[in-house]
């Protein structure tokens, strides 16, 4: 891919913001970081992750051709509102928010007509926080979702897609924000809800650590959770998530009922179904 030779600003220099900066380091002449955490900015400058850090976004936004917003869901709209007059003319804005809802419509209404906002969601992360834990490998072979809006220019949708592949994502999918939230409630949010519930159901009447195997570790890795971020994500998509939790409860009840009735046939059928489906997914 040919180098873009333009300026990039990353708003929110945490884990995902750091991954964007590292994976796009060679694609832009200048990368600015915008964050309220001066330690994160100082660290990123010293490591060459960004060229310069700013607490006040006005100057970097006015110079940037592409802006990637890596803030919590409830902060994105507020940031756009406060800075709608600071963006460079004809710049492109994208985000990394895990729940879309009506946010994209509201954001586009606030922006000047010559600014294009392309919704996106990198399906990657870790159970740790901070730019110091970011790496190029986090995005490698992960999935990337773009949620196009009717007002988006095709060239800008293509830009975000090309950059996603450059960052290491193996697949880029375009879907509506509504469909995104419905699917994510199952593939991401329900998984986190199950992991949290599993860990919290530990009765602590024995030394759990002595009896843990790979299955428990694999299922509960994501239970080490950023409570502020995931509260935002769960609450912002609660209607979809509640439906998926209820569907999961139905499936779990089938197993529970089979155990109560000593019904090995039904239990084995559930095992067979999950094995077939898991092979299809992988």
Regions found by a protein language model. Name each.
Residues 1-62:
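NAD(P)+-binding Rossmann beta1-loop-alpha1 motif at the extreme N-terminus of oxidoreductases
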Residues 4-7, 90, 141:
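Phosphate-coordination loops involved in phosphoryl transfer and adenosine-cofactor binding
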Residues 9-10, 69, 146:
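Hydrophobic Val/Ile/Leu positions in short beta-strands of Rossmann-like dinucleotide-binding domains
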Residues 58-87, 91-94:
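Rossmann-like NAD(P)-binding element
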Residues 71-73, 97-98, 122, 150:
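Short glycine-/small-residue-rich Rossmann-like dinucleotide-binding loops
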Residues 81-132:
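Rossmann-like NAD(P)(H) cofactor-binding subdomain of soluble oxidoreductases
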Residues 138-221:
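Internal alpha-helical scaffold of NAD(P)-dependent oxidoreductase catalytic cores
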Residues 205-274:
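Interdomain hinge/lid region at the active-site interface
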């Amino acid at each position: 891919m040919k180098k873009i030779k333009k300026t990039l600003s990353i708003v929110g220099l945490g884990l995902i913001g750091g991954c964007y900066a590292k994976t796009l380091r060679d694609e832009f002449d200048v990368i600015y970081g915008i964050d309220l955490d001066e330690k994160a900015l100082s660290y990123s400058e010293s490591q060459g992750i960004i060229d310069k850090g700013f607490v006040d976004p006005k100057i970097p936004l006015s110079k940037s051709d592409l802006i990637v917003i890596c803030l919590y869901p409830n902060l994105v709209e507020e940031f756009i509102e406060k800075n709608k007059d600071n963006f460079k003319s004809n710049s492109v804005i994208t985000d990394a928010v895990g729940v879309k809802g009506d946010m994209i419509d509201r954001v586009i209404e606030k922006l000047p007509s010559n600014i294009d906002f392309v919704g996106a969601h990198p399906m990657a992360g870790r159970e740790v926080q901070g730019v110091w834990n970011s790496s190029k490998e986090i995005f490698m072979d992960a999935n990337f979702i773009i949620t196009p809006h009717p007002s988006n220019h095709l060239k800008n949708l293509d830009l975000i897609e090309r950059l996603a592949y450059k960052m290491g994502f193996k697949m880029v999918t375009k879907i509506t924000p509504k469909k995104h939230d419905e699917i994510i409630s199952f593939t991401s949010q329900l998984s986190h809800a199950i992991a949290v519930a599993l860990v919290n159901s530990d009765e602590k009447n024995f030394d759990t650590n002595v009896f843990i195997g790979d299955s428990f570790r694999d299922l509960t890795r994501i239970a080490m959770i950023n409570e502020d971020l995931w509260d935002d994500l769960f609450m912002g998509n609660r209607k979809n998530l509640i439906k998926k939790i209820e569907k999961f409860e139905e499936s779990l009840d089938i197993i529970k009922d089979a155990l109560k009735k000593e019904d090995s046939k039904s239990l084995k059928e559930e095992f067979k179904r999950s094995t077939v489906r898991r092979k299809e997914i992988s």
